[in-house]
């Protein structure tokens, strides 16, 4: 295993956002987290990268775990000139070759000299993906990374992510509020609404009564699901107590 959450809870003031979450992520596994707006999906990812401190529970991490993170959006001050190359060398200086390779992996080659504020939403998401891939992550976190992309852009984005996974064996946690889009090779879907409502293969979750009740679906609604081959995993790491 790469990462395990045990009874993890997060509060904002008196408001309980995540309630006793238990999740384990294996090497090479793709996990998709779905849920309505305000269900705690983004909070969960921010907790995993250490941006939010849980009030209780523990996070167990594999030794020397490297995590890459692609946020929903990046707010850029239009008055601040910054090229893609400069952005990708902060805070760590990297060679032109390394930057170029990361952009190719993310499906947006040759934009090193462009200004960040000149990029389209889809282009910026790919640059953010390139930034995450620079870390050579063992675990890649995607927070609604395809939001704003059209269908072709979404498919292409996922293809580049899947190619990176096959190349490196990294695991992926992908967050989405779009109930009808599940990455082709998803091993497991977790339905979240403050608590874990249900989880399992895409086929299992799409037929779960809890899933249908939460999202107001009936039997005529279709979730895109795919056959897949589960990954086998081993764990060697340490426990981080946070509560």
From Swiss-Prot:
One of its GO terms (cellular component) is plasma membrane. GO terms for molecular function: ABC-type zinc transporter activity; ATP binding; ATP hydrolysis activity. It comes from the Bacteria. It is found in: Cell inner membrane. GO terms for biological process: response to zinc ion. SMART domains: AAA. ATP binds at residues 35-42. Keywords: ATP-binding, Cell inner membrane, Cell membrane, Ion transport, Membrane, Nucleotide-binding, Translocase, Transport, Zinc, Zinc transport. Its EC number is 7.2.2.20. PANTHER family: METAL TRANSPORT SYSTEM ATP-BINDING PROTEIN TM_0124-RELATED (PTHR42734), ZINC IMPORT ATP-BINDING PROTEIN ZNUC (PTHR42734:SF9). The complex is composed of two ATP-binding proteins (ZnuC), two transmembrane proteins (ZnuB) and a solute-binding protein (ZnuA). This is Zinc import ATP-binding protein ZnuC 2. It comes from Aliivibrio fischeri (strain ATCC 700601 / ES114). The gene is znuC2.
């Amino acid at each position: 295993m790469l990462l395990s959450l045990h009874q993890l809870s997060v509060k904002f003031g008196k408001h309980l956002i995540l309630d006793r979450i238990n999740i384990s992520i294996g090497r090479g596994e793709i996990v998709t987290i779905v849920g309505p707006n305000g269900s705690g999906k983004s909070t969960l990812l921010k907790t995993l990268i250490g941006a939010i401190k849980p009030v209780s529970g523990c996070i167990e991490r594999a030794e020397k775990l490297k995590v890459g993170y692609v946020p929903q959006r990046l707010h850029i001050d239009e008055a601040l000139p910054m090229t893609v190359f400069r952005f990708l060398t902060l805070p760590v200086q990297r060679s032109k070759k390394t930057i170029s390779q990361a952009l190719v992996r993310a499906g947006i080659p040759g934009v090193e000299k462009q200004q960040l504020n000149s990029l389209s939403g889809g282009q910026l998401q790919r640059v953010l993906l390139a930034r995450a891939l620079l870390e050579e992550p063992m675990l890649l976190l995607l927070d609604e990374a395809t939001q704003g992309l059209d269908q072709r852009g979404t498919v292409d984005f996922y293809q580049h992510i899947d190619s990176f996974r096959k190349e490196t064996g990294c695991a992926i946690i992908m967050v989405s509020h779009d109930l009808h889009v599940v990455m082709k090779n998803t091993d497991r879907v977790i339905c979240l609404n403050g608590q874990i409502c249900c989880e399992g293969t895409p086929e299992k979750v799409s037929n779960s009564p809890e899933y249908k009740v939460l999202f107001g679906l009936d039997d005529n609604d279709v979730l895109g699901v795919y056959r897949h081959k589960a990954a086998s995993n081993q764990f060697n790491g340490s426990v981080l107590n946070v509560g």
